[in-house]
């Protein structure tokens, strides 16, 4: 994992990542980095201060998505072939729960308060909303776009507004972004965008979505 100075736009050092790194997530204090290693079916935990590997955690097949809770107590990894969310205690570095979701989970986002987790399933064509306490699904969001084949609707990227009102979901080769009411979990509208939309991000003031 390469670390860049945002002012100079230059690489300042490298961190160990394990083989075939996919997504990664920092703890809120910035001291640890959780990296999914797809080929080895592990999550690598990196000490960002000492720039060394703390441990490696065995997970399911083809780990992909990675997120850390806002309070830093839990990390979650998605495994694309096993179809699980693996909940990892960041203190013990042990898996404490596995939540089954739809096929090929690719990305996860915690709500700003940390009480919910949103997980996209690319092949399943859904987004599951999971309660962070019970670790059980509380909603499954499906997508239907007039004139677009169901197989092309492949949700991946998710961004939640900081006020907790809306979720934006990139739908891959469907070439649309879904706007979802984050309270009712209902799709409000679909925005036509360019080809194969995957990941998303807001401008700092959240007035623009990229």
Place the predicted regions along the sequence by residue.
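Predominantly soluble domains enriched in secretory-pathway, periplasmic, or organellar proteins
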Residues: 1-210
